[in-house]
Every structure is written in C-alpha cells, then in structure tokens.
Curated annotation (Swiss-Prot):
Keywords: Activator, DNA-binding, Metal-binding, Nucleus, Repeat, Repressor, Transcription, Transcription regulation, Ubl conjugation, Zinc, Zinc-finger. This is Histone H4 transcription factor. It comes from Bos taurus (Bovine). Disulfide bonds: none annotated. GO terms for molecular function: DNA-binding transcription factor activity, RNA polymerase II-specific; RNA polymerase II cis-regulatory region sequence-specific DNA binding; zinc ion binding.
Length: 516
C-alpha cells in the first residue's frame, strides 16, 4: 500500500530489518516498509503451501519472525500484519532515539534489559482515523500517522472574535482550537497515542524527546543524582525531575463522598471503587468468590491450586502455602523475631518489624486516629533508615480554593467541609527562604520542608491552612508558598483587595506553585 499524506522530513536513518536472519538496511521508511511487506507475503504464502497438520499450520502462519519478539496470533493473519508493520514504525522511533542520545554528550546509554527492545504493544484493531467525514483505516501505523498529520496541515484557519484566526480540531467529539497548525498537530497525538521516539536499548516509547531523555537520566548513578526530595528522600539527576516527582506528593483531588484527598485521578478512582462501591466485577470460576480488582482475584485463585504457590525464603525453612495470607501469617508467627525492626514510633521510639504492628501501637498506646477520609497511616523512611509516621500532607492551592468555594455555591458537599481538614485560612508574609541546594525545615510543622528558591530579600506570601485532623486528631499546619513568575514584580506583602479568596484565585493562575 503506498504511503498517503506528506513525506516526513529527511533523516539519516539506519533502518535495519530484523526479520529472521535478514540484514537489509536502508534510510527511507517507504523502502523499508516495502521490503518488510515482501517478507510478510512470502511468510504467509509459503506457510499455506506446506503440507502440515492444521494446528501446526496456524501456529507457523501467524508467528512473527522478528528477532527478540516471539509474537503469535491465534486468530488471523490481519493481527500479524499490523504487528509486523508496527515493528517497522518502532524501528524508526529507535533510530530517532539513538540520534537524540548521541546529541547528548553527557548521557550514558540505557542500562535496562536489551532483550525487551523489540517487544511492542498488542494491536487488536485497525488504526482508525476519526477526523470528521473520514474514518479511513490502516494496518501500518506509519501511514496512519502521516494521514492524520495531513489533516492538520490541510485544516483551514477560521475567524473567531476580532482578528483571531484559529484552527479547529476535527477529531470526533473534540472542540479544541489552536493558534496554528503545528499546535494542532501536537494535540492530535493525544487522540492517536502517537509516540515520536523510542529507546534504542530497551525499546520503550515516548511522546517527546524530553521524556525519553528523562528515562535515561533516571538511570544515573547515585553520585550524579544531586537533587533530593525532602519529603521521601529520593534522589534525581535534574531539578526538573525532582519537581515532577514532588507533584506526586501534593493532593489535587478530593473524594465527593468523604474527606479523602489524593494526588492522582487514578488514586481517586481506586478509592471510589474500594470505599464507596459495592460492585465486585471479578468473579472466581471455581467458587462463589468475587472481588473488586484483578490482583485480589489472582491471590484467591492461588488457594485453588494443587501445588503450593508460596514458599518461605528463610534459610533452612521448608514451609509452603497456597495463599499469600498463609505465608504472611507464617512469617509473622515464626520469623518475626529474625528480622531487623524497620518501623519506629516517633513518640516513644519503640521499634517493630512490620508497619501493621506500629499502626496498632499508635492507635492503642497513643490514641492516634487516621487522618479524616484516609483508611490508614503512611510511613516515611528517615535518614537513620527507620520508617516513621508521615506527619505532613500537602494539599494543592486549587483544591483549597475548591473546598472554600463549595459552601458559597450551596454545593451538596458543604456539609463535608465542616468535617474536612480545612478549618481556617490566614494570609501573612515571611522573609526569604534558602536556595534550592538547601533544605528548609519548618519548626513545629511536624516534618521536613521542600527546598525553595532564594527570594532575594523580598517577602513571599504564604497561606497557612490549619488542618483540624492530623494523625493525633489535633490541628496541624500546611504551608503554601506562592512564587512570582520569572521577570514579574514580586507579590505585594499585603493581602489583595479580594481578600484571601482573591489571593487563592491568583495562586491558581500562577505558572508555578510550590509547597513547604
């Protein structure tokens, strides 16, 4: 099939065929795909001519011969065709990844398993274009992505408002607009899931070069990881990787049915499924057991196994069990004293080998309560290697604003606000904080703070959110530091005319909001 759409920019690529023992190399995707098509035709036709049993014929006919792959389609040849053409596309992405890596003299190659470099995702269906009035389908992802790019390049500008020319996304159900066709082209990748680069070593695919290079930098040796998270002590090679990581410590989402807050939409979905839904879609075929996720079902299926699925890994111990619960119970009863205690109470310094035991101790001995909306305690590793109770929780300014706005809007969640963590808002200023290489520790804050950029003697506005429910059921303080954007004047030390809500609104619009 000839490649539709516009020919991509010329690249000095070394596209090497890895079908069986083939050593063909070329630099153009058109020639490369045409060559691989010949392999496919010979493979499918040749297998059909062999006089073998039907079962052996099917197994041979739909097996991929690409090196380090091992894919076999039990259904039909169309799955194999899409799969092999994806190898062509993947080969190009790995070449672009090699070029990107060679342009970074300070980076070493990926150190992950080389044998996974040709493992690609399952392609169950045709690549279908959902641009309005189109719906063309493709077996080759290279032609599909070129076709979608052609839509973006042919899209006409439209006048919206006064002197505003924009291009509209024509993808089914999308209403986004963009200032130019280049931005539209980038946006379309969110619809097609197109990747633009792959790791030449492990084969991982990425949406842009930045994410690919981050993949390499995360493998840096410890002596090159100079940026440390003050909340969990993980280290990173660049400040941007540290900032990306820190966002996972900040809660941006609140459950509409309780006070639980969490950092990710996936965390909220899991919480809703486990805490507020009675649905148990995962059912055992051997008995009446049902559960809420696949992991629990797999654990249960182990109990139906004739052979023990778990064995004790302590030296000279031959205990085995069919369930994870039984093996954990064995560890607790027999070997708990053999392990070094890693969990330490921050109140009385008593040590425990398991987090469960520390949880029971905190609740019974010190009358600690779980944070409102949360079903358990979280423990954090400290510099001495012990895991202690995490006393600090970070809530985003946007979430704070949402919670404050709910009673004013008459929301049904207003009642939950009275029981939530937010109880009082105070706006004040503090002097400049230490630079990014230093750690700022809040006195009386119950935990470490995140390193902050120097403010050069100016005051930065801080919003103190007084939480009603910390681990002990007492008030704790969450600190929000709002930074001005580079090149903009520093924020005023007095509250704006809009009061606290005005400051919160401004914070939500700031390009960078960091927490301490």
């Amino acid at each position: 099939m000839p490649p539709p759409g516009k020919v991509p920019r010329k690249e000095n690529l070394g596209l090497q065929c890895e079908w069986g023992s083939c050593s063909f190399v070329c630099s153009a995707m058109e020639e490369f795909c045409e060559h691989v098509t010949q392999h496919l035709q010979q493979h499918l036709q040749g297998s059909g001519e062999e006089e073998e049993e039907e079962e052996d014929l099917l197994e041979e006919e739909f097996s991929c011969l690409w090196r380090e792959c091992g894919f076999c389609s039990p259904d039909n040849s169309a799955d194999l065709i899409r799969h092999v053409y994806f190898h062509c596309y993947h080969t190009k992405l790995k070449q672009w990844g090699l070029q990107a890596l060679q342009s970074q003299a300070d980076l070493s190659p990926c150190i992950l398993d080389f044998q996974s470099r040709n493992l690609i995702p399952d392609i169950p269906d045709h690549f279908l274009c959902l641009w309005e009035h189109c719906e063309n389908s493709f077996d080759n992802p290279e032609w599909f992505y070129r076709h979608v790019e052609a839509h973006s390049q042919c899209c006409e500008y439209q006048v919206v408002g006064k002197d505003n020319n924009v291009v509209l996304c024509g993808w089914k159900g999308c209403t986004c607009t963009f200032k130019d066709r280049f931005k539209l082209r980038e946006h379309l990748r969110s619809h097609t899931q197109e990747k633009v680069v792959a790791c030449p070593t492990c084969g991982g695919m990425f949406a842009n070069n930045t994410k690919f290079l981050d993949h390499i930098r995360r493998q840096s040796s410890l002596d090159q990881q100079h940026f440390q998270c003050s909340h969990c002590s993980k280290r990173f090679a660049t400040e941007r990787l540290l900032r990306d990581h820190m966002r996972n410590h900040v809660n941006h989402y609140k459950c509409p049915l309780c006070d639980m807050t969490c950092p990710l939409p996936s965390s909220l979905r899991n919480h809703m499924r486990f805490r507020h839904s009675e649905a148990r879609p995962f059912k055992c075929d051997c008995c009446d057991y049902s559960c809420k996720n696949l992991i629990d079902l797999r654990k249960h299926l182990d109990t139906h196994s004739k052979e023990p699925a778990y064995s004790c890994d302590f030296e000279n111990c031959t205990f085995s069990a069919r369930s994870l619960y039984s093996i954990k119970s064995h560890y607790r009863k027999v070997h708990e004293g053999d392990s070094e205690p890693r969990y330490r109470c921050h109140v009385c310094d008593k040590c425990f080998t398991r987090g469960n035991n520390l949880t029971v101790h905190l609740r019974k001995k010190h009358q600690f309560k779980w944070p409102s909306g949360h079903p358990r305690f979280r423990y954090k590793e400290h510099e001495d290697g012990y895991m202690r109770l995490q006393l600090v929780r970070y809530e985003s300014v946007e979430l704070t604003q949402q919670l404050l706005r709910q009673p004013q809007e008459g929301s049904g969640l207003g009642a939950s606000l009275n029981e939530s963590s937010l109880q009082d808002i105070i706006l004040e200023t503090v002097p400049g904080e230490p630079g990014p290489q230093e750690e700022a520790e809040e006195e009386g804050g119950g935990g470490e703070g995140i390193a902050l950029p120097a403010s050069q003697g100016t005051s930065s506005p801080i919003i103190h959110v007084v939480n009603q429910t910390n681990a002990q059921g007492e008030r704790e303080v969450v600190y929000y530091v709002l930074f001005e954007a580079p090149g903009e004047p520093p924020p005023a030390s007095e509250p704006p005319s809009g009061g606290v809500m005005g400051e919160l609104q401004g914070a939500a619009e700031e390009p960078e909001v960091q927490m301490v």
